[in-house]
Amino acid sequence: MSSKKMVNSVEGCADDALAGLVASNPDLQLLQGHRVALRSDLDTLKGRVALLSGGGSGHEPAHAGFIGKGMLTGVIAGSVFASPPVGSILAAIRAVAQAGTVGTLLIVKNYTGDRLNFGLAMEQAKAEGISVEMVIVEDDSAFTVLKKAGRRGLCGTVLIHKVAGALAEEGMGLEEITKRVSVIAKTMGTLGVSLSSCSVPGATHTFELAADEIELGLGIHGEAGVRRIKIAPVDQIVTLMLDHMTNTSNIFHVPVRSGSSVVLIVNNLGGLSFLELGIIADAAIRLLEGRGVKVARALVGTFMSALEMPGVSLTLMLVDEPVLKLIDAETTAKAWPHMAKVSVTGRKRIRAAPTEPPEAPEATAAGGVTSKQMALVLDRICTTLIGLEEHLNALDRAAGDGDCGSTHSRAAKAIQGWLKEGPSLTSPAQVLSRLSVLLLERMGGSSGALYGLFLTAAAQPLKAKTDLPTWSAAMDAGLESMQKYGKAAPGDRTMLDSLWAAAQEFQAWKSPGASLLPVLTKAVKSAEAAAEATKNMEAGAGRASYISSAQLDQPDPGAVAAAAIFRAILEVLQTQGA
């Protein structure tokens, strides 16, 4: 069975894709009757050398994405993974010649069909008196022994577009550009790796891999590589790739050694996420620098793809200052990244963290709660939440991803670790503020953010006083902040239901003569009743709000956890006779 693709038709997909690129880019025009894209300002290039490239479609943004001032003049596109026809290549050569250019350089990847078709078109154009030269790019470092067909042309071709484009923009002649580019093209190598193959529209995947395998040294047309290896951490995979590319026993190695300066391309072959691409880029830069290699520039993104192939290729080009100047030259090509003209290696990448503001003197524990009791309370809360881990996870599976208990347990263990450090617990405001930071950093998820908001706001009133009315005010402040940013309200089947119920009881602390334990006892009972009542509520916030109410027949785990926290506080204070 063929794979699914977003196309109008298999036959017309290459035409439609190029038409879409031109329609959305005012700097491009289609050549009538051909699958050719040209610069729309072609007539301004009189007296300059034109640069044409191309090949099969399916490698986007290559090659048409690199048309622009300072790069390509035009591109001839074939069908998916198929060389463009001779007639279209010749038409493109004629078009740029008739616009007044003084010669055309064809930049061609080393594939048999491309060499034949571009070569034939070049010979026909020369027979018509047009000045044309061709550079064949061979940057594949996968094969370790010489093959008759030579090396494949891969993502390094994009760097040749850039270098040649900069030289043409300087006004250099065709013969000199050809010589310079031919030399530079021999200083680079590319190696790819993929998690699976790709599929041409209307066809199945080109090869199959086991679930734990990846393909090393594959090409950009879905063809298999030189070796299959087991999936491993990115650092190991990138190390293997760099070792293979720079191994002197490999006839096609890149002569990179300590002290070398390189341009690095981390190229998405089509199906990798940006997250994965960033991880690979970090590994490649770090590992190259660890070998004493200076990474002068790093290009990270999609430059030459293989449809939806979930893989990456690494390209290394040895550079000196003159070549780097060509890489840095301005271009209007849409697919070329905007890069600072600053070396990657040697640049300061980490900014010092901001300093904590000096802490103002704050009120110490009052209201009958000592620092010793506070430590006992926190410890009991932690053991309670750890003990509830599986129960809370079970409740969460009906409406979430089943990790509510694990999230609370993780927070509890983080607090236990902090308590072992022997922190000062004399200032409730400082304790709540520190807990807020701890939960934001270690608890994670929405719960960590909500508790962080609650504790940060609750700490503010306690900076001045810590009597019972202020503890009630702290509860109010925490709930207000939680509602403001969490957008939940009482009755929405969240942890807020338990917290709100307790807060209503805490209002009694604002009355003269109120006692700690009687009010806290009532608050705990109200919180537990509110948590139990959530099983009859329709969720109005959180992930559970996307679940049918018919499926929600258990209490909300967040509300249960909040009620359990109040119960733990009460039990400790009762034991301590607060």
Swiss-Prot record:
Its GO biological process annotations read: carbohydrate phosphorylation; fructose catabolic process to hydroxyacetone phosphate and glyceraldehyde-3-phosphate; glycerol metabolic process; glycolytic process through fructose-1-phosphate; negative regulation of MDA-5 signaling pathway
The note on the cofactor says: Manganese or cobalt are requested for FAD-AMP lyase activity.
How is the subunit organization of this protein annotated in UniProt? Answer: Homodimer. Interacts with IFIH1 (via the CARD domains), the interaction is inhibited by viral infection.
Traced from the root, the source organism's taxonomic lineage reads:
Eukaryota, Metazoa, Chordata, Craniata, Vertebrata
Which Gene Ontology CC terms are recorded? cytosol
**Domain statement:** DhaK and DhaL domains have differential roles, individually DhaK is inactive and DhaL displays cyclase but not kinase activity.
> From which organism does this entry originate?
Mus musculus
- The positions annotated for binding ATP are D401, G402, D403, C404, S446, S447, G486, T494, M495, D556, P557, G558
The chain positions of domain DhaL read: 372-571
Q: Which molecular function term from Gene Ontology is one that the record holds?
A: FAD-AMP lyase (cyclizing) activity
Under the heading SMART domains, the entry gives: Dak2
EC assignment? 2.7.1.28, 2.7.1.29, 4.6.1.15
**Which residue range or ranges hold the DhaK domain?**
9-336
The chain residues annotated with the modification Phosphoserine are S511, S545
Protein name in UniProt:
Triokinase/FMN cyclase
Positions annotated to bind dihydroxyacetone: G56, S57, G58, H59, K109, D114
Sorted keywords for this record are:
ATP-binding, Cobalt, FAD, Flavoprotein, Kinase, Lyase, Magnesium, Manganese, Metal-binding, Multifunctional enzyme, Nucleotide-binding, Phosphoprotein, Transferase
Please give the catalytic activity noted in the UniProt record.
Answer: dihydroxyacetone + ATP = dihydroxyacetone phosphate + ADP + H(+); D-glyceraldehyde + ATP = D-glyceraldehyde 3-phosphate + ADP + H(+); FAD = riboflavin cyclic-4',5'-phosphate + AMP + H(+)
Q: Which InterPro entries match?
A: DhaK_ATP, DhaK_dom, DhaL_dom, DhaL_dom_sf, Dihydroxyacetone_Kinase
Please list the cofactors this protein needs.
Answer: Mg(2+); Mn(2+); Co(2+)
